[in-house]
Amino acid sequence: MATIFDILNTLNNNNFENCKRQCSTNKSNKTIIDILPPMDVTMTNDKLIIETELAGISKDQIEIDIKDSILTIQGEKKKNLNKQQQQLVIEKSSTSPSSSTLDSKENGPSIEEFEDDIKPKSTTSTTTVSTATTTKENKEDENKTKSSDKKFISERSFGNFKRYLDLTKVLYQLDLNSINTQFENGLLTITINKKLHYSNTIKININ
């Protein structure tokens, strides 16, 4: 019968290997793990409690699953934009021409190519200069906004997070139909009740 000491020993022995695996690049889907959330695991007489700190993350950004006796907690912590940055994105999207429009103008045939005798070339050059001037002004406004933000300390982490917990040694004790999750104040709590009657030995009768 596995005890809480077996679980703790498993966690301690595999801690560094798990960190290497969880913080490395996954070649299958090329996902880089940027954050390794801290975790506490407690076994009581009637339940297993798993607590994981996920500050600054909403519950919609968290995915939890159990596959092949491995509990996985993963998701993405996104950086929130302030009001000034949000306004800049809105203004840029509303004033700047889309890339598809620019591509169609550059790659597709223009009216001037078919009406060289009707439309003077000076008009085309004037339009080009005007467009270049507008683009330059937009870049200058963007640079001014960026230069106004002065970051003195940057210690917060953003990106993909993932944490594994191997339940192989205690899975036979747990009632997976009783899993309960709570997420409050940045703390994810997963509670799994233990079975009333459990055994890691299966008795086989001879017919």
Curated annotation (Swiss-Prot):
Residues 84-101, 122-135 have a biased composition (Low complexity). The keyword Transcription regulation does not apply. Belongs to the small heat shock protein (HSP20) family. Gene3D superfamilies: 2.60.40.790. The keyword Iron-sulfur does not apply. This is Small heat shock protein hspG7. Residues 84-149 are annotated as: Disordered. Residues 136-149 have a biased composition (Basic and acidic residues). InterPro entries: A-crystallin/Hsp20_dom (IPR002068), HSP20-like_chaperone (IPR008978), HspG1-11-like (IPR051779). Keywords: Stress response. It holds the Pfam family HSP20. Residues 30-207 form the sHSP domain.
